[in-house]
Amino acid sequence: MKRPRALPTYAVSIFMAGDIETAKRHIRRCCYEDALCVTVTPTTFIYTAGEEAGFTVGFVNYPRFPRVPSRLRARAMKLARELMRECCQRSALVMDASRTDWLTLDPPALARSKSP
């Protein structure tokens, strides 16, 4: 029997509205190409004057695919930006134990309409 491997605990989460099936298709490709293991969980966002379905993506420092915290967070940030485009969303949150980043993106059509 192999000896269990242990790593320091570190987790990063992405929070985003949008279609979970679209997100899972993209995440599946990313995991296949980049040796990742993540969780994908449906969630509901309730906020002032509204409600939206979405999902969370959980990254953990999985011993099979170990990464230092800075690389794990960077990969979560990259995936969040990719998912914003794939799921046609304007924003996402990336959160770990010490920091939350709110990412925003103007859709290409909106960005073009702002140009002179």
Task: Label the predicted regions.
Residues 15-17, 41, 60, 95:
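A structural detector for beta-sheet-dominated domains
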Residues 36-73:
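Short, intrinsically disordered low-complexity segments
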Residues 52-58, 101-116:
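Short, low-order "capping/linker" segments at domain edges
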